[in-house]
Structure formats: C-alpha cells, structure tokens
C-alpha cells in the first residue's frame, strides 16, 4: 500500500468570512456556511446567503469543520461561500474518488480532533 498526503490528491480550500454586510436571509447571492452548525445529515442547510463571497466551494466538494467541533463532514450540494470554520476539499478524480476521501476523513475523525489546538475552542 502506498500512502500519499491529502494535498497531493486533493485541493484544500480554507474558508474565509466575507464582510458581514454581504450576508442576507432572503436568498440573494449564494449559500453561506460558517461552520458545522449549518450541517445536515449529508448536506448543509441554507439559512444565510452571501452576495460578496470570498472563498467558494463547488458542488460535490467535501466540507470539513476546522473549528470546534473539528472533523464534522458534509457534501456541498451547490456552489457556496465558506466561512472560517470550514474548509472545502476537492479530490482530483483522476487520483482518488470523492467517496473514498469522505470515508477516509470520517474514519480519521478522532485523530483530527486530537490535533486541534486553542484554549477557547479547538481548531486545526
């Protein structure tokens, strides 16, 4: 078996919070997810939109919580803006499948949580 770094088979896009003046609850712009509080069983639930996104995840990207609680996962069901509490992982499908990466990360949840640092809340 050959082990490779995640960054060698996936693009990792760390979230960034857009200006709060671009947030809205009336559907203008694209869905905005700040962290795993927006996560559903498989896909996030849209409550807030953003009309000036800074970091974007594409449909079928894996969304991972990078702030407490670390490691929660969802799939992006559409193009969306991601805040500082999330990262989007885009597998290079010529190297690895989306499902493999999702379940691999799910299996590494305890290890990811153990890597968290911070006194107020854990983050990776």
Model-identified regions with their sequence ranges:
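Hydrophobic (often cysteine-bearing) scaffold residues that line and stabilize catalytic clefts
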Residues: 2, 97, 121
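Specificity-determining recognition surfaces
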Residues: 105-124
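Short beta-strand/loop turn elements enriched in aromatics
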Residues: 18-36
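A short beta-sheet element
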Residues: 34-36, 43-108
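Non-catalytic DNA-recognition/assembly elements of restriction-modification systems
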Residues: 1-17
């Amino acid at each position: 078996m050959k082990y490779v770094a995640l960054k060698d088979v996936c693009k990792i896009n760390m979230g960034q919070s857009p200006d709060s003046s671009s947030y809205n609850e009336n559907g203008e712009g694209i869905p905005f997810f700040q962290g795993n509080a927006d996560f559903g069983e498989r896909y996030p639930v849209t409550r807030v939109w953003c009309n000036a996104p800074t970091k974007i995840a594409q449909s079928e990207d894996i969304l991972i919580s990078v702030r407490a609680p670390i490691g929660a996962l969802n799939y992006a069901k559409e193009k969306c803006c991601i805040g500082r509490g999330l990262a989007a992982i885009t597998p290079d499908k010529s190297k690895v499948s989306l499902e493999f990466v999702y379940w691999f990360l799910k299996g590494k949840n305890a290890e990811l949580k153990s890597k968290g640092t911070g006194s107020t809340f854990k983050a990776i």
